[in-house]
A protein has these predicted regions:
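Transmembrane beta-barrel wall of Gram-negative outer-membrane proteins
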Residues: 183-287
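C-terminal transmembrane beta-barrel domains of outer membrane proteins
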Residues: 82, 330-533
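Feature captures outer-membrane beta-barrel proteins of Gram-negative bacteria and organelles
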Residues: 149-158, 176-189, 207-219, 226, ...
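Outer-membrane beta-barrel translocator domains and adjoining extracellular loop/strand segments
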Residues: 151, 177-183, 206-212, 224-227, ...
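Outer-envelope beta-barrel architecture signal
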Residues: 39, 122, 132-134, 147, ...
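Periplasmic polypeptide-binding modules associated with outer-membrane biogenesis and secretion
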Residues: 3, 31-155, 166-170, 175-184, ...
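Transmembrane beta-strand segments that form the barrel wall of outer-membrane beta-barrel proteins
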Residues: 82, 113-115, 132-142, 149-172, ...
Length: 533
């Protein structure tokens, strides 16, 4: 996808958030040997099927069958995603950003844009290789003896249009869920966006949607989106494994956001945004016959500043493909108003400031990224609710066939709404061989050290294989109880597809546990999706 939406944090009934997009490349550069910036005369699109049958390691019958069944991405989709056109001046930054935009469609396993000359005229050659996009879902994961399984179908490139459709049935120890989803990155226009999801749960229903035109590139000047939610569901609130605090939630929400960039280039931007939201959201104990009904309204405004930069790595979170790592310097500042006249009780009405930022230091084959964010609600000048969070990631590939990672993060909540508490089993940002809901609360920390060793980058032309010794330490707890921390040291086997549209890695981890958060044997096993840093 060509945009990213910042999470909308809601504390004590006040919604704080905004939608932004961060795409970039380096500064524009002239072609070697040219005294003036040349003009792009033509764009050549070369789109290959999933397998190149001329390659020595092409898996024979499987390769031929996959190529025959797969609907190749349409050339018009590729051209429509590019941020440059014939007749434009050559800009290396926009060309690099176009390459990232194609990767963000999540329909290709390989993307490369180069320049060439045809009869002395400058041409861009866009070479892509489709990934296998039709994925029957038969999944199984286990951590600390708690099992989750799923079955379904995901099509990430429906009829070669780069639109996705999802139908998945998922069973966890908590509930059964049937999910339907659809994403269209060119809805009604070249840069229009549509995203919709419906979840039919064994204990409720929930639907969400988003439509509009986001900041689809670094130099984009305008954005407008609208999103919403409708839900009638149970909210599970865990405290040391106990779910006696289960509540019912009913919600209907509609929001709009508009943005304008008074300064925007291929290297950075200054964006101003204005957003509003109308919401009905109520919570009540299970079995309530007369459900309460509340109506709220909020409005917010703010600013985003960014100097944008991406680093291209391989074998970081996947195998045999180029990955874009965001090493931008960004700052987000905003404030939301929730007046009594718009439905908030006197004890909850107020203002909600929010701020977040990222600093990064890249080097050849490595980087360090520091991120922090905070938001809250002030009523009568006194903090009523809020959230603070921060993370540091350091990664290095300076040793051959190794990715060394050090990651630390922490966060704290004040008076969160039901269901917004931390649950490290669901979010996968905690010790990885512990059972379901072992770490829940309003405080959390996590330290991870991992050395991802490459065994095979493209085994049999189908998958990458690696191993990773790891050390995890962290946990979650409530403010009125002692810190609940545990850890594990162990080894994981990592296997990921190399011909699929997404390179998500499956992880089989075995570890020796210590500290709190488990009972029984100190040895734990986890089979799940690999951690993405």
């Amino acid at each position: 996808m060509i945009c990213s939406n910042r999470a909308v944090w809601r504390t004590a009934g006040l919604a704080v958030g905004t939608a932004t997009a961060l795409l970039t490349a380096g500064p524009p550069a002239r072609l070697a040997g040219q005294s003036t910036t040349p003009t792009i005369d033509t764009i050549i699109v070369v789109n290959r099927n999933v397998f190149d049958l001329q390659e020595a390691d092409a898996p024979g019958f499987i390769a031929r069958l996959a190529n025959r069944l797969h609907a190749r991405t349409r050339a018009g989709v590729i051209r429509g995603t590019l941020l440059v056109n014939p007749g434009d001046r050559y800009d290396s930054a926009r060309v690099a950003e176009s390459e990232r935009a194609l990767r963000n469609l999540n329909v290709f396993s390989r993307v490369r844009i180069d320049t060439t000359r045809l009869d002395g005229r400058l041409a861009l050659r866009v070479a892509t290789t489709d990934g296998w996009s039709t994925k029957p879902q038969i999944g199984y994961s286990s951590a600390g003896g708690d099992v989750t399984w799923l079955v379904g179908l995901v099509e990430d490139n429906l009829l070669g249009t780069a639109t996705s459709f999802t139908a998945v049935y998922n069973k966890t120890p908590d509930r059964r869920t049937f999910d339907l989803g659809h994403v269209n990155p060119h809805f009604l226009s070249r840069h229009g966006w549509l995203q919709a999801r419906y979840s039919n749960k064994s204990d409720g229903d929930r639907g969400t949607w988003l439509v509009g035109v986001p900041f689809y590139e670094t130099a984009a000047r305008r954005a407008f989106t609208t999103d919403g939610e409708a839900a009638s569901e149970r909210v599970l609130v865990f405290r040391d494994g106990d779910t006696s605090a289960i509540v019912e939630r009913r919600a209907l929400r509609v929001g709009i956001a508009a943005g304008f960039a008074p300064h925007a280039t291929s290297a950075g931007y200054l964006r101003l945004w204005l957003a509003g939201q109308w919401r009905r959201e109520d919570f009540a104990p299970e079995g309530t016959t007369v459900f309460p009904r509340s109506v709220f309204g909020t409005v917010g405004a703010g600013m985003d500043v960014g100097h944008v930069r991406f680093q291209v790595l391989e074998r970081f979170n996947s195998y045999a493909r180029r990955e874009d790592v965001d090493v931008s310097q960004v700052l987000h500042v905003g404030v939301w108003a929730a007046p009594r006249a718009w439905g908030y009780p006197s004890g909850q009405a107020g203002v909600g400031p929010e701020v977040s930022g990222q600093l990064a230091a890249p080097w050849r084959r490595g980087f360090a990224v520091l991120w922090a964010a905070a938001n809250g609600v002030l009523t009568g000048g006194v903090p009523d609710s809020g959230r603070v969070a921060g993370a540091l990631t350091i990664a290095s590939q300076n040793l051959r066939h190794q990715t060394l990672i050090v990651h630390a993060e922490g966060a704290a909540l004040r008076r969160p709404k039901p269901g917004a508490e931390f649950d490290l089993w669901n979010s996968q940002n905690g010790p990885r061989v512990f059972g379901i809901h072992q770490f829940t609360g309003t405080r959390r920390v996590w330290l991870a050290l991992e050395d991802r060793l490459l065994v095979a980058d493209d085994l049999w032309g189908l998958m990458g294989v690696g191993v990773a010794p790891f050390l995890d330490y962290g946990g979650a707890w409530y403010a009125d109880e002692p810190a609940r921390l545990g850890g594990a040291v162990g080894m994981s086997l990592r296997i990921g597809p190399t011909r699929a549209v997404r390179g998500d890695v499956a992880e089989f981890a075995v570890g020796y546990r210590f500290g709190k958060g488990f009972s029984g044997s100190r040895w734990g096993l986890a089979i799940r999706k690999g951690v993405r840093y």
